[in-house]
Design a protein with these regions (language model features):
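Non-catalytic interaction/Regulatory regions outside core domains
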Residues: 1-139
Length: 139
């Protein structure tokens, strides 16, 4: 029996590419999982847990070798988003793949919510919810 190594594809909801159209993602690149800025971001995300869930927001953490929250490889994501290994960089991505906000330090809760709530996709979701329709039009 042949085995093929797993790789992230657009159809894999666990990959950043596969999350597109389904989730918003806060991606945090950090030099180390012990970095104080990442600890601060984790605390912010813990405070936002309910509001993040309401907005379909996932949290992906990436150190030089490991990715937590997605199936992608750290080196590939660093190349894709052009983030050097020793840099701390947070990127908030909308469901359509657009970058909503970037930061070289922890992204504050209010800034995250304002960026998401100001996005056209979120306004459409809220409008559809008030009309009693699903957040996404299935066709």
């Amino acid at each position: 029996m042949l085995t093929v190594p797993a790789s992230a594809t657009h159809d894999d909801l666990r990959s950043i590419a596969g999350m597109r159209g389904h989730y918003r993602v806060l991606i945090v690149f950090t030099p180390s999982f012990a970095d104080a800025r990442l600890a601060a971001q984790r605390a912010i995300m813990a405070q936002l847990a309910l509001k993040a869930a309401e907005r379909d927001l996932l949290f992906v953490q990436i150190d030089p070798m490991t990715v937590i929250g997605a199936s992608d490889r750290a080196d590939k994501l660093r190349r894709k988003f052009v983030v050097p290994v020793l840099n701390y960089h947070a990127i908030l991505i909308d469901k359509d793949g657009r970058t909503l906000r970037e930061s070289h330090g922890p992204m504050e809760a209010g800034a995250i919510l304002r960026a998401i709530d100001g996005a056209a996709s979120r306004r459409i979701e809220v409008k559809r919810a008030h009309m009693g329709k699903p957040a996404v039009d299935k066709g």
